[in-house]
């Protein structure tokens, strides 16, 4: 006789990552009013919103190419922004970069990582929130500073729906 095998119950930890349709939903889930970048390089739009362990809000922006994709190397490249109240590096990027520099941006100490002129990673703490921003395609330090200077507490987040 053939004996039917019982499917083994799922064993292990539930995923620490939760996807959300909007930044507002993720912020409510975390019970945080996250500071968000109001300025990004032209062409970047929200691709996804998620939380990690209810500690870190992650917003991934992706470059949407215009008419001529052959002329823009940023096509498909992402900017990963994370914010939370946990201490330490929350960027998720632990690569060693040639240059690490610390500068003040509007009175806030910011650590930049990358090359002499180009930035791949920026991290800072402001108003009790810890921030990390990773650029798949590096930006110059002035662009990174402009993004950081304009990462502020929201009055209302821009709607994003999947």
Model-derived regions: residue spans:
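Short, solvent-exposed recognition patches
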Residues: 8-126
